[in-house]
């Protein structure tokens, strides 16, 4: 980590933040201690006002170069030669942070199914402890898509004037029944795996393959599959789309964990920034920072109407839209449009 240095450093470093303080959860439960895996790149400027905090989606990690390579990195929009870039793996995720396979400090054994249900607000609270640990009094920009956008919006509420800009991409202020329904069907797929319920790291792996295949149908748009998975010859079986979905399921199951998927999908379901704050419109109206809400015209999971709703109810809101055939996943694909939108926003709102 290179908070301040007389030499320009853009090499990314990965570290573990060990928090010995208890983290109280919305459920009333708590973690007596926890850890977050995080990366930093670049350095703080003299005014300490160049912090960009990147928030990953459901199965992401703390290395945004791998999943947002068109936006973050040398000579990209968020260039570490100009910004101090932070990205932390969420609480509950399986890339180095406290998660269901971590040992419970109360008994020294893995949590497994005793891992507490967490919310997007809990995830934001854990991130804020890391912010304090890093000595960051203010953040220039929090940016995230999907689950990352939900966490970003929660964090924007609690950060108040410590945050200058929140960029919320393909996300919402409250989880819709549609999203919860998709997540529930995926958890049902995991439950149907005969290994689910067993105290072993690989439990639910085959079910996770199916869950991911279901998820892929919501991350894209029918036009995506029509363009990329249509057959060029007459067939009665062995369709491209079938092998594609099986491949995507296997690919995720080999790099992720079913228990983390379960926990984070539940966190996504829990998202409601108005809970305990007088309702969603009131919570949005209390956000102090400038908010850029970006929707995708073909997103069937987090609809563009939900993104537009955010911008209408925050005091300093801007709405922009990505046009794409790729549905929800457009925020990870349409870099040219994203860069244009971001450039316009910063020019208009940040001098």
UniProtKB/Swiss-Prot annotation:
Keyword Iron-sulfur found: no
Pathway assigned in UniProt: Amino-acid biosynthesis; L-methionine biosynthesis via de novo pathway; O-acetyl-L-homoserine from L-homoserine: step 1/1
Record keywords, A-Z: Acyltransferase, Amino-acid biosynthesis, Cytoplasm, Methionine biosynthesis, Transferase
Any coiled-coil regions, as ranges: none
Catalytic activity: L-homoserine + acetyl-CoA = O-acetyl-L-homoserine + CoA
MF terms (GO), sorted A to Z: homoserine O-acetyltransferase activity
Localisation: Cytoplasm
SUPFAM superfamilies: alpha/beta-Hydrolases
UniProt cross-references to Pfam families, sorted A to Z: Abhydrolase_1
Sequence positions that bind substrate: 212, 329
Gene Ontology biological-process entries: homoserine metabolic process; methionine biosynthetic process
Record-level GO cellular component terms: cytoplasm
Entry annotation: catalytic residues: 146, 299, 328
Residue ranges annotated for the AB hydrolase-1 domain, each copy included: 51-334
Matching InterPro entries: AB_hydrolase_1 (IPR000073), AB_hydrolase_fold (IPR029058), HAT_MetX-like (IPR008220)
Domain of life where this protein originates: Bacteria
Free-text function comment from the UniProt entry: Transfers an acetyl group from acetyl-CoA to L-homoserine, forming acetyl-L-homoserine.
Cross-referenced PANTHER family: HOMOSERINE O-ACETYLTRANSFERASE
Similarity remark: Belongs to the AB hydrolase superfamily. MetX family.
Protein name: Homoserine O-acetyltransferase
Organism this protein belongs to: Cyclobacterium marinum (strain ATCC 25205 / DSM 745 / LMG 13164 / NCIMB 1802)
């Amino acid at each position: 980590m290179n908070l301040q240095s007389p030499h320009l450093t853009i090499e990314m470093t990965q570290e573990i933040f060990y928090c010995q303080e208890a983290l109280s959860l919305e459920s009333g439960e708590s973690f007596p201690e926890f850890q977050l895996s995080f990366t930093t790149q670049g350095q703080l400027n003299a005014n300490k006002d160049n912090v960009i905090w990147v928030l990953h989606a459901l199965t992401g990690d703390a290395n945004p170069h791998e999943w947002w390579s068109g936006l973050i990195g040398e000579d990209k929009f968020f260039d570490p030669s100009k910004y101090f870039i932070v990205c932390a793996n969420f609480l509950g995720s399986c890339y180095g942070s406290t998660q269901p396979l971590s040992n419970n400090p109360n008994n020294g054994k893995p949590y497994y199914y005793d891992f507490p249900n967490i919310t997007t607000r809990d995830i934001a609270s854990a991130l804020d402890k890391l912010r304090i640990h890093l000595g960051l009094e203010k953040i220039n920009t929090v940016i995230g898509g999907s689950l990352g956008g939900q966490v970003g919006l929660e964090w924007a509420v609690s950060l108040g004037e410590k945050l200058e800009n929140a960029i919320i991409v393909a996300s919402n202020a409250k989880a819709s029944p549609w999203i919860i329904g998709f997540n529930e069907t995926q958890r049902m797929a995991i439950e149907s795996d005969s290994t689910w319920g067993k105290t072993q790291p690989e439990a639910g792996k085959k079910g996770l393959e199916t869950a991911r295949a279901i998820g892929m149908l919501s991350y894209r748009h029918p036009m995506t599959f029509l363009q990329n998975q249509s057959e060029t010859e007459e067939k009665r079986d062995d369709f491209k789309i079938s092998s594609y979905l099986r491949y995507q399921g296997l690919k995720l199951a080999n790099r992720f964990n079913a228990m983390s998927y379960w926990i984070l999908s539940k966190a996504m379901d829990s998202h409601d920034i108005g809970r305990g704050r007088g309702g969603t419109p009131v919570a949005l109206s209390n956000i102090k920072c400038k908010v850029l809400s970006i929707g995708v015209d073909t997103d069937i999971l987090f609809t563009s109407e939900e993104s537009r709703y955010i911008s209408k109810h925050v005091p300093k809101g801007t709405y922009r839209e990505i046009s794409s055939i790729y549905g929800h996943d457009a925020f990870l694909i349409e870099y040219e449009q994203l860069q244009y939108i971001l450039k316009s926003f910063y020019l208009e709102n940040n001098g």
